Regions:
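N-proximal low-complexity "stem/linker" segments adjacent to membrane-targeting elements
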Residues: 2-32
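Short loop->beta transition adjacent to catalytic acidic/histidine clusters or analogous donor-positioning motifs
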Residues: 10, 30-43, 62-66
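Short His-Asn-centered micro-motif
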Residues: 12-17, 40-41, 107-110
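Catalytic phosphate/metal-binding cores of nucleic-acid and nucleotide-processing enzymes, i.e., regions
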Residues: 13, 93, 126-128
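Hydrophobic/aromatic beta-strand patches that form the interior of the parallel beta-sheet core
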Residues: 38, 66-68, 106, 129
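Active-site-proximal specificity loops/subdomain of glycosyltransferases
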Residues: 45-102
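Short beta-strand-to-loop acidic/aromatic patch adjacent to the donor-nucleotide binding site
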Residues: 101-113
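Conserved donor-nucleotide/metal-binding helix-loop-beta segment in metal-dependent transferases, i.e.
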Residues: 116-129
Length: 129
């Protein structure tokens, strides 16, 4: 809806580990340009060690934030990139309950913040990329 010419939503998806400051920055830069932030945090780090959840509760009351917790261990403690991919897949599964096929969804690392000016009235040339 924001920055788009139709009724579709722009959804920003990230995995979260422990950098609350980075998410705070991302949220404040993009909040006027993105319709929804979808975050997935795991109870395990990418080496499969149990960790505490670090996402700040102040964001849980934001209408624009959907937060999901992956609460099962990763199958392999040595394949950190595969474990991150599992976390993203879990995020994608949960997107099915909140996104529509008309929505535009982008995944990035939490520290890869898009330039918000590029999200204003942008034109999509292809749905997937």
């Amino acid at each position: 809806m924001i920055g788009l010419m139709d009724n579709s939503k722009l959804i920003d998806c990230i995995t979260f580990f422990d950098n609350t400051t980075m998410f705070d920055l991302r949220f404040n830069i993009l909040k006027n340009h993105v319709d929804l932030f979808v975050i997935c945090e795991s109870e395990y780090d990418h080496r499969n060690n149990k960790k505490k959840l670090n996402f700040e509760t102040k964001f849980l009351n934001e209408k624009k934030v959907k937060y999901f917790v992956l609460n099962k261990p990763f199958p392999n403690e040595t394949e950190i990139w595969k474990n991150q991919a599992i976390q993203r897949e879990y995020l994608l599964e949960n997107l099915k309950t909140i996104a529509n096929k008309e929505d535009y969804i982008f995944f990035s690392d939490p520290d890869e913040i898009p330039n918000p000016q590029l999200l204003i009235n942008f034109e999509i040339k292809k749905k997937f990329g």
